[in-house]
Every structure is written in structure tokens, then in C-alpha cells.
Amino acid sequence: LKHGIPTVSRFGGLLELKDKKPMRFVEIIMYDGTSIDPLEIFIRSGMTNYMGAIKTGNGKIGASFREFPAHSRDMVEQLADRLKRIGLGGLVKIGLPGQSLLDIPVNEGRIGAIVIGGLNPMSIFEETGVRTYSRALAGLIDFKRLFRYEEMEDRLREFL
């Protein structure tokens, strides 16, 4: 968003890897159909195989599918390269305008992109029998609990 690229997050899913290459989504949950992060569901359900993905290049990892305007493809690629250089390479694959990406249809005038899910490292714990409690940085809150950011310092003083 900082770079003026409007993004549509379509779904979170389990991305199957073979020989370290993304093959297909084997499960998906549309973001507009849940208030829980789909990756949390897949991890807690024991559906991931992140250990296999990092050890052999074959497994199932959490990933999300995003869409960007087609004219922003070059900028998205540049940003992905910059992030990768500093160790934050999360974009797995970027599609072509109006073309399906891993058999997922993309709206006309848009490109698809697959982004590695941030909760994936937590799946290692679950896969090895260590129960975890994690929540994505999203959720619902009662509107009455919100306040202006200028009040933050005073509110923090109440707790210190």
C-alpha cells in the first residue's frame, strides 16, 4: 500500500511443493468467508508438511493468493526483489496479466501472486507435537474500545 499498489487478498491455502517448486493449492479458505486466519486452521489441524518442504523440497506450506492491478507487475517484481535481498523474500510466484496462476483464475486486468504465510514457522512446532497458541495480526474488536492514537502515551502510563 505504501507504494500505491492496491492489493486484494483472495484466500489462504495449503501450497503443495515438489522439488522446491510450487505446484498447486490443495486446500483453500476464502478470506471473505472467515474471521480466522486460514493458515491458523491448517496448522492447528495438522495439515501442513513444512518440515518436508524445508528438508526435501516436498511438502505443504501455508500461502496466500493476492491480486494486483496488471499495470503494477513491474513494481511488484521490483519490490519482491528488494525484499528478497534483505532476507524477506515472501513472494513465491507472480503471474501474468489476466492469466491463471497455478490453475487459480485471475480477474481481467489483474495479476495473481502467491505469498508465503507468516505463520509457517509455527507449523514446525505443531508437526513435532508441540502445541502452540498463535494468532494472526488481524481480528475483530468492539468499536467502543478504539481510541485516537494521540491518547496512547497517557493510556500506557495507566499500566506502568
Model-derived features with residue positions:
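Anaerobic metallocofactor- and corrinoid-dependent redox/one-carbon enzyme cores
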Residues: 2-160
